[in-house]
A protein has these predicted regions:
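C-terminal nucleotide
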Residues: 1-79, 91-133
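Glycine-rich active-site/cofactor-binding loop and its immediate structural neighborhood
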Residues: 87
Length: 133
């Protein structure tokens, strides 16, 4: 897609882009571990770091950046784009359902078309699902 093409062109012209991509990979592995052990605070931090990199790589969108900042300023532990990039969808990690509801309302007031609230589900080392709602 468009985001992949954009990143490929940056990799060819910007030596720091490769390090940024490597950081995203490292954060993804750490995020998986956070999900496995239920460390939502560190997961949120990793989401924020990833969003900063994605924005610098130019695959975010100003509206998604705004929504991420609004999420964080209204209680989210982390927020980052998801999907193919270049706009569209944001995930905000909140400590509880009331925080999620507050953030959904704020985002809708700022133009979000749809919001969904889903509990965080993680896997333990045996592969059993755990609902953290």
């Amino acid at each position: 897609g468009l985001a992949v093409q954009h990143v490929k062109s940056q990799l060819a012209s910007d030596p720091q882009a490769e390090a940024a991509i490597e950081s995203l990979g490292k954060y993804a592995k750490q995020a998986r571990h956070c999900l496995a052990i239920g460390d939502s605070k560190k997961l949120g931090l990793l989401m924020n770091r990833s969003q900063t990199i994605l924005s610098k790589l130019g695959v975010s969108h100003p509206t998604l950046d705004l929504f991420a900042n609004l999420s964080l300023s209204n209680g989210a532990l982390g927020a980052k784009l998801t999907g193919g990039g270049m706009g569209g969808c944001l995930i905000s990690l909140t400590p509880d359902k009331p925080s999620a509801e507050k953030i959904a309302t704020v985002l809708e007031k700022h133009g979000a078309i749809h919001t969904w609230i889903e509990p965080l589900v993680t896997l333990n080392r045996k592969g059993d699902h755990h609902d953290h709602s």
